[in-house]
Amino acid sequence: MEEKNIYQPYLMRVAAIIDETPDVKTFRLEFINEEEGKNFKFMAGQFGEYSVFGEGESTFCIASSPTREGYIECTFRKMGRVTKALASREIGDTIGFRGPYGNTFPIDQWKGKSLLFVTGGIALPPLRCVIWNALDLRDNFKDITIVYGARSVNDLVYKHELEEWGKRGDVKLITTVD
């Protein structure tokens, strides 16, 4: 099998958009080439280059869990030219994705241990992938505690997931606001 050119982006379809806050969005991206999607593998903690053709590319973590195949998710704050262009995309639009790149969380080494995740604001997306990875493999770990804070209630990302995690009987969730 021919190896993928790391400089050639995968073509991705924006399948879903969640407005997390007024300036933060989450995109669910599906591979336009289904075969590429079936063969795509990544590990919790890796990142990618997300591109809007004609505007440039920006680097974000892959915010979804590798246990959930067929799509990837990214969460970003609208800040500069590229993220503003990304934020203007609509469901069905095409963007580019290069990756996965970078180091990973050593989740296999954590088996049988208690896990503590501490994060704040827009720094939750890099941990979200490993949190969902651990929750999808829940029997492998002892206690799971998530401590998450933000400047205000309006700045909390993944509110729907925070609510879900808080209702689970097998996770301790602590949220704070300044």
Segments predicted by a language model, with ranges:
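Ferredoxin-reductase
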Residues: E2-D93, A150-S152, D178
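FNR/FR-type flavoprotein reductase catalytic core
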Residues: N5, R81-D178
